[in-house]
Amino acid sequence: MSEYELPPLPYDYDALEPHISEQVLTWHHDTHHQGYVNGWNDAEETLAENRETGDHASTAGALGDVTHNGSGHILHTLFWQSMSPAGGDEPSGALADRIAADFGSYENWRAEFEAAASAASGWALLVYDSHSNTLRNVAVDNHDEGALWGSHPILALDVWEHSYYYDYGPDRGSFVDAFFEVVDWDEPTERFEQAAERFE
Protein backbone atom coordinates (compact mmCIF):
# COMPACT_ATOMS: atom_id res chain seq x y z
CA MET A 1 0.00 0.00 0.00
CA SER A 2 1.42 3.37 -0.99
CA GLU A 3 1.47 6.09 1.64
CA TYR A 4 0.01 9.55 1.23
CA GLU A 5 2.51 12.37 1.63
CA LEU A 6 2.25 16.04 2.53
CA PRO A 7 2.88 18.11 -0.60
CA PRO A 8 5.05 21.19 -0.14
CA LEU A 9 3.41 24.58 -0.24
CA PRO A 10 3.54 26.02 -3.77
CA TYR A 11 5.08 29.23 -2.34
CA ASP A 12 7.14 30.33 0.66
CA TYR A 13 5.53 30.39 4.09
CA ASP A 14 5.69 34.19 4.23
CA ALA A 15 4.53 34.70 0.63
CA LEU A 16 0.91 35.53 1.48
CA GLU A 17 1.67 38.19 4.09
CA PRO A 18 0.16 40.49 5.22
CA HIS A 19 -3.08 38.68 4.36
CA ILE A 20 -2.13 35.32 5.88
CA SER A 21 0.84 35.28 8.23
CA GLU A 22 3.90 33.09 8.00
CA GLN A 23 3.07 31.69 11.44
CA VAL A 24 -0.43 30.62 10.40
CA LEU A 25 0.76 29.02 7.16
CA THR A 26 3.49 27.15 9.05
CA TRP A 27 1.12 25.80 11.68
CA HIS A 28 -1.64 25.13 9.18
CA HIS A 29 0.48 23.27 6.64
CA ASP A 30 3.10 21.57 8.80
CA THR A 31 0.86 20.59 11.72
CA HIS A 32 -2.79 20.49 10.69
CA HIS A 33 -2.42 19.29 7.10
CA GLN A 34 0.31 16.84 8.13
CA GLY A 35 -2.06 15.49 10.75
CA TYR A 36 -4.67 14.64 8.13
CA VAL A 37 -2.06 12.89 6.00
CA ASN A 38 -0.91 10.88 9.01
CA GLY A 39 -4.50 10.08 9.99
CA TRP A 40 -5.33 8.83 6.51
CA ASN A 41 -2.26 6.61 6.41
CA ASP A 42 -3.00 5.22 9.88
CA ALA A 43 -6.60 4.45 8.92
CA GLU A 44 -5.55 2.67 5.74
CA GLU A 45 -3.04 0.62 7.72
CA THR A 46 -5.76 -0.37 10.19
CA LEU A 47 -8.08 -1.43 7.36
CA ALA A 48 -5.33 -3.47 5.71
CA GLU A 49 -4.54 -5.24 8.98
CA ASN A 50 -8.21 -5.96 9.62
CA ARG A 51 -8.66 -7.45 6.15
CA GLU A 52 -5.67 -9.68 6.74
CA THR A 53 -6.70 -10.87 10.20
CA GLY A 54 -10.46 -10.92 9.68
CA ASP A 55 -10.92 -8.97 12.92
CA HIS A 56 -13.07 -5.95 12.06
CA ALA A 57 -13.66 -4.57 15.54
CA SER A 58 -11.90 -1.32 14.61
CA THR A 59 -13.07 -1.17 10.98
CA ALA A 60 -16.01 1.22 11.44
CA GLY A 61 -13.81 3.80 13.12
CA ALA A 62 -11.11 3.42 10.50
CA LEU A 63 -13.62 3.93 7.68
CA GLY A 64 -14.71 7.19 9.28
CA ASP A 65 -11.08 8.21 9.68
CA VAL A 66 -10.47 7.62 5.96
CA THR A 67 -13.35 9.91 5.02
CA HIS A 68 -12.44 12.63 7.52
CA ASN A 69 -8.68 12.64 7.07
CA GLY A 70 -8.71 11.87 3.35
CA SER A 71 -11.10 14.72 2.66
CA GLY A 72 -9.03 16.98 4.90
CA HIS A 73 -5.89 16.17 2.95
CA ILE A 74 -7.54 16.63 -0.45
CA LEU A 75 -9.23 19.92 0.45
CA HIS A 76 -6.12 21.40 2.06
CA THR A 77 -4.13 20.60 -1.07
CA LEU A 78 -6.76 22.42 -3.15
CA PHE A 79 -6.76 25.32 -0.67
CA TRP A 80 -3.01 25.91 -1.05
CA GLN A 81 -3.40 25.75 -4.83
CA SER A 82 -6.24 28.28 -4.72
CA MET A 83 -3.89 31.04 -3.51
CA SER A 84 -0.64 32.69 -4.54
CA PRO A 85 1.27 35.91 -3.83
CA ALA A 86 0.40 36.99 -7.38
CA GLY A 87 -3.32 36.40 -6.81
CA GLY A 88 -6.15 38.76 -6.08
CA ASP A 89 -7.71 39.03 -9.51
CA GLU A 90 -11.09 37.90 -10.75
CA PRO A 91 -11.40 34.78 -12.93
CA SER A 92 -11.17 35.11 -16.69
CA GLY A 93 -11.91 33.06 -19.78
CA ALA A 94 -14.17 30.03 -19.72
CA LEU A 95 -14.50 29.92 -15.94
CA ALA A 96 -15.51 33.58 -15.77
CA ASP A 97 -18.09 32.98 -18.48
CA ARG A 98 -19.53 29.98 -16.65
CA ILE A 99 -19.68 31.84 -13.34
CA ALA A 100 -21.61 34.63 -15.04
CA ALA A 101 -23.94 32.12 -16.70
CA ASP A 102 -24.61 30.05 -13.58
CA PHE A 103 -24.74 32.82 -10.96
CA GLY A 104 -25.75 35.87 -13.00
CA SER A 105 -22.50 37.72 -12.34
CA TYR A 106 -19.16 37.39 -10.57
CA GLU A 107 -20.53 39.64 -7.82
CA ASN A 108 -23.49 37.31 -7.26
CA TRP A 109 -21.17 34.31 -7.14
CA ARG A 110 -18.86 35.99 -4.62
CA ALA A 111 -21.73 37.07 -2.37
CA GLU A 112 -23.08 33.51 -2.34
CA PHE A 113 -19.60 32.06 -1.73
CA GLU A 114 -19.07 34.46 1.17
CA ALA A 115 -22.43 33.37 2.61
CA ALA A 116 -21.25 29.76 2.44
CA ALA A 117 -18.00 30.77 4.15
CA SER A 118 -19.89 32.48 6.96
CA ALA A 119 -22.19 29.50 7.52
CA ALA A 120 -19.80 26.56 7.23
CA SER A 121 -17.87 25.02 10.10
CA GLY A 122 -15.30 23.66 7.69
CA TRP A 123 -15.11 24.78 4.08
CA ALA A 124 -16.64 27.01 1.44
CA LEU A 125 -16.27 25.32 -1.94
CA LEU A 126 -17.00 26.22 -5.52
CA VAL A 127 -17.74 22.89 -7.18
CA TYR A 128 -18.63 21.58 -10.60
CA ASP A 129 -21.84 19.54 -10.32
CA SER A 130 -21.57 16.73 -12.89
CA HIS A 131 -25.29 15.91 -12.60
CA SER A 132 -26.48 19.31 -13.82
CA ASN A 133 -23.24 20.48 -15.48
CA THR A 134 -23.33 23.66 -13.43
CA LEU A 135 -21.15 25.40 -10.90
CA ARG A 136 -22.40 25.51 -7.32
CA ASN A 137 -21.25 26.88 -3.99
CA VAL A 138 -21.45 24.50 -1.05
CA ALA A 139 -20.90 24.94 2.68
CA VAL A 140 -19.13 21.88 4.09
CA ASP A 141 -18.89 21.13 7.81
CA ASN A 142 -15.74 19.43 9.03
CA HIS A 143 -14.26 18.05 5.80
CA ASP A 144 -16.99 15.73 4.63
CA GLU A 145 -20.44 16.85 5.80
CA GLY A 146 -22.55 18.76 3.29
CA ALA A 147 -20.60 17.78 0.19
CA LEU A 148 -22.57 16.98 -2.95
CA TRP A 149 -22.08 13.54 -4.52
CA GLY A 150 -20.81 13.79 -8.07
CA SER A 151 -19.38 17.26 -7.59
CA HIS A 152 -15.78 18.22 -8.24
CA PRO A 153 -14.15 20.95 -6.12
CA ILE A 154 -12.91 23.89 -8.18
CA LEU A 155 -11.99 26.44 -5.48
CA ALA A 156 -11.51 25.76 -1.76
CA LEU A 157 -11.54 28.11 1.23
CA ASP A 158 -10.78 26.67 4.66
CA VAL A 159 -12.84 28.40 7.34
CA TRP A 160 -11.86 26.22 10.27
CA GLU A 161 -10.74 28.50 13.10
CA HIS A 162 -7.14 27.34 12.78
CA SER A 163 -7.09 29.10 9.39
CA TYR A 164 -7.62 32.58 10.73
CA TYR A 165 -7.92 32.96 14.50
CA TYR A 166 -4.27 33.83 15.10
CA ASP A 167 -4.40 36.59 12.47
CA TYR A 168 -7.99 37.83 12.73
CA GLY A 169 -9.44 36.58 16.00
CA PRO A 170 -13.17 35.85 15.66
CA ASP A 171 -13.49 38.14 12.61
CA ARG A 172 -13.95 35.47 9.96
CA GLY A 173 -15.26 38.02 7.47
CA SER A 174 -11.93 39.84 7.40
CA PHE A 175 -10.18 36.54 6.74
CA VAL A 176 -12.53 35.84 3.83
CA ASP A 177 -11.74 39.31 2.46
CA ALA A 178 -8.04 38.51 2.85
CA PHE A 179 -8.49 35.27 0.92
CA PHE A 180 -9.78 37.25 -2.04
CA GLU A 181 -6.60 39.36 -1.92
CA VAL A 182 -4.54 36.24 -2.67
CA VAL A 183 -6.98 34.00 -4.55
CA ASP A 184 -5.34 32.61 -7.68
CA TRP A 185 -7.66 31.36 -10.41
CA ASP A 186 -5.12 29.46 -12.52
CA GLU A 187 -5.53 26.06 -10.83
CA PRO A 188 -9.30 26.41 -10.35
CA THR A 189 -9.67 27.32 -14.02
CA GLU A 190 -7.75 24.21 -15.01
CA ARG A 191 -9.89 22.04 -12.73
CA PHE A 192 -13.07 23.54 -14.19
CA GLU A 193 -11.92 22.96 -17.76
CA GLN A 194 -11.03 19.34 -16.99
CA ALA A 195 -14.43 18.71 -15.40
CA ALA A 196 -16.34 20.40 -18.21
CA GLU A 197 -14.40 18.46 -20.84
CA ARG A 198 -15.16 15.19 -19.09
CA PHE A 199 -18.86 15.68 -18.42
CA GLU A 200 -20.20 17.98 -21.12
From Swiss-Prot:
Gene3D superfamilies: Fe,Mn superoxide dismutase (SOD) domain, Iron/manganese superoxide dismutase, C-terminal domain
Keywords: Manganese, Metal-binding, Oxidoreductase
Domain of life: Archaea
The reaction(s) this protein catalyses: 2 superoxide + 2 H(+) = H2O2 + O2
InterPro entries: Fe/Mn_Superoxide_Dismutase, Mn/Fe_SOD, Mn/Fe_SOD_BS, Mn/Fe_SOD_C, Mn/Fe_SOD_N, Mn/Fe_SOD_N_sf, SOD_C_sf, Superox_dis_Halo
EC code: 1.15.1.1
One GO MF term: metal ion binding
Gene Ontology terms: cellular component: cytoplasm
Family: Belongs to the iron/manganese superoxide dismutase family.
UniProt function note: Destroys superoxide anion radicals which are normally produced within the cells and which are toxic to biological systems.
PANTHER family associated with the record: SUPEROXIDE DISMUTASE 2, SUPEROXIDE DISMUTASE [MN], MITOCHONDRIAL
Protein's recorded name: Superoxide dismutase [Mn] 1
Source species taxonomy: Archaea, Methanobacteriati, Methanobacteriota, Stenosarchaea group, Halobacteria
Gene coding for it: sod1
